[in-house]
Amino acid sequence: MPTTGPPPPLPGDRPLPSSFDNDEDFYNENGFQKIARKLKQEPLVPLGCVLTVAAFTGAYRAMRAGDHGRVNRMFRYRIAAQGFTILAMVAGGIYYSDDRHKEREMWKAKRDADEEEKRLKWIKELEARDEEDKLAKEIMDKRRQRAAAAAAKREGRAVEDKAAEGGAAAAQDAKSSSGLSWASAPGWFGGNKNEPDANAQTNTGDAEKPSEK
């Protein structure tokens, strides 16, 4: 993650000034750059390592050649080179102790800042997911409400249609029964005026038959 400067100090912790405060590359360097910076700060340490390796190589070659005097001399050089390397490391550690302590503090602060940023991003992502879930739930609830309203409307229409059909059937039945009642009334209201005379003639005929016998 690129940064433009040192991370902000933690609350209640005011760091001491350091030579790295204005060095932006210090916070953006990789492993190779860090090693190069260490070599530039303490050049005597790699020099002592090179001298130690050279003395050990010379002792090995003298041993292969059978020159015991040179072997002893090279081993003494190796011991001296190792002592020089250790001394350079100790002196560099003492000289750069404050900067190293500051470097560790800055590294811890940067690590804490990165962890805090990751935590905030994680919280924001959870909040965004929560909002998405709430929005999806609201949309589903609205869809269910619309579906329920549409179903209720369809049921209401079906009930109204059934009621209208029942009313029409009742009106048709009432009309049919009214027509039958008017048709069964005698006289001018729709009945047959000759029916009583026919009944009377039938009765008269029946009465005249015994007298003929």
From Swiss-Prot:
UniProt KW keywords: Coiled coil, Membrane, Mitochondrion, Transmembrane, Transmembrane helix
Cellular component GO terms, alphabetical: mitochondrial membrane
Pfam families listed in its UniProt record: HIG_1_N
Composition skew (Low complexity), residue ranges: 165-175
Record field: compositional bias (Pro residues): 1-14
PROSITE patterns: HIG1 (PS51503)
Top-rank taxon: Eukaryota
Keyword Transmembrane: yes
Subcellular location: Mitochondrion membrane
Keyword Transferase applies: no
Its membrane topology: Multi-pass membrane protein
Ranges for region Disordered: 1-23, 142-213
Basic and acidic residues compositional bias, start-end: 152-164
Residue ranges that the Swiss-Prot or TrEMBL entry lists as coiled coil: 100-149
Domain (HIG1) ranges: 16-107
Chief location of this protein within or outside the cell: mitochondrion
Subunit and interaction comment: Associates with the respiratory chain complex III/complex IV supercomplex.
Role noted for this protein: Cytochrome c oxidase subunit which plays a role in assembly of respiratory supercomplexes.
Family: Belongs to the RCF1 family.
Protein name, per record: Respiratory supercomplex factor 1, mitochondrial
Primary gene name: RCF1
